[in-house]
Amino acid sequence: MERYDKASLNAANVPLPEFSQNEGSLVATLKTLLFFTVLMIMLPIGLYFSSKVYVFEGTYGMSNRDSYFYAAIVAVVAVHVVLAMFVYVAWNEGSRQWREGKQD
């Protein structure tokens, strides 16, 4: 298979757009999304089991049934905190990119 460069593919000699600024923005956005995706999965599950075993059953001496209930509440609160953090970061990232684009 032959390798083609930009000049040979651009027969009309129209300048090709460069996406280097957008690619950096896209990579940063994907890193943020990946971070919050991992956090959304790991934090509630980890808090559920650790709070069930160590806090509710270990420290407070609750029954198995009660500890399930309260650990689920802790996990749901953790999900909402992660979602709120994601919205905050995404909002600030979008407004920062908008301000940088407006100044150009």
Swiss-Prot record:
It comes from the Eukaryota. Residues 1-25, 90-104 are cytoplasmic. Keywords: Cytoplasmic vesicle, Endoplasmic reticulum, Membrane, Transmembrane, Transmembrane helix. Its main location: endoplasmic reticulum. The chain crosses the membrane at residues 26-46, 69-89. PANTHER family: VACUOLAR ATPASE ASSEMBLY INTEGRAL MEMBRANE PROTEIN VMA21 (PTHR31792:SF3). HAMAP family: VMA21 (MF_03058). This is Vacuolar ATPase assembly integral membrane protein vma21. It comes from Xenopus tropicalis (Western clawed frog).
